[in-house]
């Protein structure tokens, strides 16, 4: 059973035995709270964490039904399971109170390394997703033909170095910001589209202008999924008012994240930034 849950019973005036969830105040190894709300739950059957709260509700209901089935013969009266999916049971309100008011933040950032389709995982990997392909040797004829057509050998080496650093995990330590500059139609977006396909689920899009605006307190919300890659297809660094936040992001410094309708929390982002621009960087 998940370690933050206890199955309890009580009798009603009509003699019905109610089976309901009781949530334990503790530092759980199966549940994470971030920003004063639900963040993730461990799903043993998948071997992954999930940030979908519905998965948590379904898992709790499964535990309730399992308990009811295993102990049905021990009850003399009829039983009623108070499910999370039933809004009239009031259990969903108890859950929200537990996550949002009674528990304190306790979390480990998820997805800080790539998980390929052939990568074994456990709870301590803190992974919530997988890429849909394995990491193994193979032919790269199409890639070689494309890159030799649109980029010089020197520029191609830089791009492949950046991609390789993400695959091997070194990008989390690099204090680099990749800017693809050139005229329209020179293949900048082509490369970024390939990067997105390579790291599906591990990238997010960002707005450099928002990061450089001192008045935008929610600029880091674009990074709330803790991406390993952040991409802007059409950026303009000339409009940056204050580069402090951008520099801290590139340097992987500890930053305060302000998400809408949630409490602030601190995080050290591990992403490598890519930007396409038609304007020279000064």
Residue ranges: model-predicted function:
Residues 1-126:
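Intein modules and their embedded homing endonuclease domains
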Residues 31-55, 107-228:
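P-loop NTPase catalytic core of nucleic-acid-dependent motor ATPases
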Residues 59, 63, 191-194, 241-249, ...:
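Alpha-helical scaffold elements adjacent to nucleotide-binding pockets in ATP/GTP-utilizing enzyme cores
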Residues 179, 230-231, 273-275:
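Structured core elements
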Residues 200, 243-265:
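Conserved catalytic/switch belt of AAA+ P-loop NTPases
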Residues 218-225, 258-276:
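AAA+/SF3 P-loop NTPase mechanochemical coupling elements
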Residues 233-235:
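Walker B catalytic acidic pair
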Residues 280-282:
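Short regulatory helix/loop adjacent to the ATP-binding pocket of P-loop NTPases
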């Amino acid at each position: 059973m998940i370690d933050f849950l206890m199955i309890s019973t009580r009798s009603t005036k009509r003699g019905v035995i109610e089976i309901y969830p009781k949530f334990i105040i503790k530092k759980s190894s199966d549940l994470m709270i971030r920003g004063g709300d639900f963040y993730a739950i461990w799903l043993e059957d998948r071997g992954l964490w999930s940030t979908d709260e519905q998965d948590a509700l379904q898992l709790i209901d499964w535990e309730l039904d399992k308990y009811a089935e295993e102990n049905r013969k021990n009850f003399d009266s009829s039983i009623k399971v108070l499910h999370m999916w039933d809004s009239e049971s009031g259990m969903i309100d108890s859950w929200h109170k537990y996550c949002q008011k009674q528990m304190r933040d306790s979390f480990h950032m998820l997805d800080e390394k790539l998980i390929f389709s052939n990568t074994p995982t456990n709870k301590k990997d803190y992974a919530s997703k997988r890429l849909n392909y394995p990491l193994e040797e193979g032919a790269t004829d199409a890639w070689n033909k494309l890159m030799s057509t649109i980029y010089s050998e020197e520029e191609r080496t830089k791009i492949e170095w950046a991609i390789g650093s993400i695959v091997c995990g070194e990008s989390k330590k690099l204090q680099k910001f990749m800017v693809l500059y050139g005229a329209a139609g020179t293949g900048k977006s082509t490369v970024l589209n390939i990067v997105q396909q390579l790291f599906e689920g591990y990238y997010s899009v960002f707005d450099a202008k928002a990061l450089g605006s001192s008045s935008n307190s929610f600029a880091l919300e674009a990074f709330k999924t803790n991406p390993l890659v952040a991409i802007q297809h059409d950026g303009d660094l000339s409009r940056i008012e204050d580069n402090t936040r951008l520099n801290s992001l590139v340097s992987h410094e500890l930053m305060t994240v302000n998400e809408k309708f949630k409490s602030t929390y601190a995080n050290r982002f591990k992403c490598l930034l890519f930007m396409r621009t038609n304007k020279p960087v000064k």
